């Protein structure tokens, strides 16, 4: 696998940064994967890490000194990072390995007293700064936040995005921006706040019924929102909101202001007033100039948007049928393409091209919801692998093809993973596949108390794998937006997350269910559906929830070891396939329908 940037370009980038560090009397430079909104997915302007290191993964932290450059990534990216950093001067630092200290500890241990660490305060969260200062300050190390040294060294840095912001009609949103603002203001008053700052892009888009295209795959736009008790201000780049939309917003007492004025406006808030903001989603550059009192808590909109309304869920169910129909047509094509691959070569890139074309035929299709993961055999062992023109595999011979894909529609966001056997699967592959399927079914069938901390559900999914002394490094579930980000919170199904009040499972939340098992250098398996919390009933012990499975697409049964499935697990699988067939058959014809009918026949041992 080749790197996304050449070894020489990475070396040139590091050399330029080190020269700038020397000129600024800076001993270390910290480059987080972040922007002024602490987004998971970044606009091109903020893609500093790939330019600096050549690593193309979506998450990672870089530390550079005059004689060291390190990239910190978690286990999802170890295999990918090893390949992409090969031949560079960047060391791979594995988060979670005892021999590799966290980047904060590394800085504290390696830098001398009196050293200075530079990091762009516009992209550093308050919580991250506090963690850094707790380790660096006692050792006499200074943190400098007003320098963007990597950005100054990037000669062809892309501009900030200028695409127009779009209005999301209430017929799709389900509630007006006035109603949503009223809910947020109620929460502000409950916490004694006259003002509330929102910097998270999906919160801003949800709250104001707006969408954009500033970040690949995520229908959001660069913005901050400052909410008062009677009006609100939307800070965006010039030209992004046209006159007609500006007038619509003004009807809701939302007024458009220049993007770069937000810090100044915040600094001018009355000292006697109180500002509510989320310290985990707000940067130092915005908060350091405040004079007002503050309340630090999660954005109320984060809770509100996670609990989808009945209106939104009805749209999502329709979108799942559309997406499922496109997927059936795709898998019917794939089956034929694999059969003919000796004559017409098939590769990982062709998977994404065909999926995109078929989804684009569906009403309301907007875009992919993330870069498609099409990974054959060893590539599947990298959970976040992406095929590129420079590096992709041919699909031929025997093996497992993992396809993780999703789409944005006007009425919802999809995310699904299926594994397709190519040729004849081996017994070890079948064993792994069956274990992952058992894990997915276990979580799908679970009933649990309303309000339980979502990380506590993780062990249920992992138990079938733990029984085999197997494990996977990523979380089992993440929240999913409503025609918004494919990753949202506050819920997360991962035992590595800290159970807290904000992770409570509530009705209407959409979460992924995606256990996996990865054999580096051999294969990867992940099976994923989206599920929604719904009431399972009440008893003397309170209300309980269960999952409604939203995703509609057959699960491959070729790799199942029937002897390893219990009767109740087989019953769940057959009931799921019956529902898939019932809802998708009316939307299909020809080869797609034939494939669906074949792939939803009852499974028997």
Model-based region annotation:
Residues 1-605:
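Active-site neighborhoods and metal-handling regions in enzymes and metal-associated proteins
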């Amino acid at each position: 696998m080749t790197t996304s940037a050449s070894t020489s370009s990475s070396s040139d980038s590091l050399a330029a940064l080190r020269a700038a560090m020397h000129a600024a009397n800076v001993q270390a430079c910290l480059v987080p994967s972040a922007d002024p909104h602490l987004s998971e997915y970044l606009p091109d302007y903020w893609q500093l890490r790939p330019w600096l290191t050549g690593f193309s993964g979506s998450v990672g932290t870089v530390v550079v000194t005059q004689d060291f450059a390190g990239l910190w990534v978690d286990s999802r990216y170890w295999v990918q990072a090893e390949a992409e950093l090969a031949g560079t001067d960047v060391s791979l630092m594995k988060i979670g390995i005892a021999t590799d200290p966290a980047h904060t500890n590394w800085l504290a241990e390696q830098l001398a007293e009196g050293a200075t660490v530079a990091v762009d305060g516009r992209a550093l969260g308050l919580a991250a700064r506090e963690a850094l200062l707790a380790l660096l300050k006692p050792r006499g190390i200074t943190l400098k936040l007003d320098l963007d040294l990597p950005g100054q060294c990037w000669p062809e840095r892309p501009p900030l995005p200028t695409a127009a912001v779009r209005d999301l009609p209430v017929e799709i949103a389900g509630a007006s921006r006035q109603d949503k603002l009223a809910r947020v203001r109620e929460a502000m008053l409950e916490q004694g706040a006259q003002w509330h700052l929102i910097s998270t892009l999906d919160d801003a888009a949800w709250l104001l019924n707006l969408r954009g295209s500033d970040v690949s795959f995520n229908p959001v736009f660069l913005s901050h929102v400052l909410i008062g008790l009677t009006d609100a201000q939307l800070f965006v780049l010039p030209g992004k909101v046209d006159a007609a939309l500006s007038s619509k917003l003004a009807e809701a007492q939302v007024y458009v202001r220049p993007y770069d004025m937000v810090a100044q406006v915040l600094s001018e808030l009355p000292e006697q007033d109180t500002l509510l903001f989320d310290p985990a989603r707000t940067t130092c550059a915005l908060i350091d100039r405040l004079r007002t009192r503050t309340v630090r808590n999660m954005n109320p909109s984060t809770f509100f948007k996670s609990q989808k309304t009945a209106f939104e869920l009805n749209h999502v169910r329709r979108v799942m049928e559309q997406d499922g129909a496109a997927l059936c047509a795709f898998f019917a094509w794939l089956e034929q393409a694999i059969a003919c691959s000796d004559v017409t070569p098939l590769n990982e890139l062709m998977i994404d091209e065909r999926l995109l074309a078929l989804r684009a035929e569906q009403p309301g299709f907007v875009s992919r919801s993330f870069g498609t993961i099409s990974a054959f055999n060893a590539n599947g062992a990298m959970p976040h692998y992406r095929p590129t023109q420079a590096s992709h595999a041919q699909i031929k011979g025997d093996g497992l093809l993992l396809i993780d894909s999703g789409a944005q529609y006007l009425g919802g966001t999809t995310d699904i993973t299926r594994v397709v056997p190519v040729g004849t699967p081996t017994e070890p592959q079948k064993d792994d596949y069956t274990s992952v399927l058992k894990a997915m079914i276990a979580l799908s069938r679970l009933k649990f108390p309303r309000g339980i901390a979502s990380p506590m559900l993780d062990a249920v999914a992992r138990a079938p794998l733990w029984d085999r002394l197997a494990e996977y490094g990523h979380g089992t579930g993440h929240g999913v937006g409503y025609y918004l980000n494919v990753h949202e919170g506050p819920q997360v199904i991962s035992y590595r997350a800290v159970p807290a009040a904000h992770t409570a499972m509530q009705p209407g939340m959409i979460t992924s269910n995606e256990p996996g098992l990865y054999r580096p250098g051999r294969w990867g398996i992940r099976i994923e559906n989206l599920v929604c919390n719904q009431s399972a009933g009440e008893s003397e012990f309170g209300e309980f929830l269960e999952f409604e499975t939203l995703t509609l697409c057959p699960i491959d049964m070729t790799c199942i070891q029937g002897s390893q499935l219990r009767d109740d697990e087989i019953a769940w699988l057959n009931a799921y396939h019956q529902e898939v067939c019932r809802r998708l058959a009316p939307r299909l014809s020809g080869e797609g329908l034939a494939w669906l009918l074949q792939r939803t026949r009852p499974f028997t041992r």
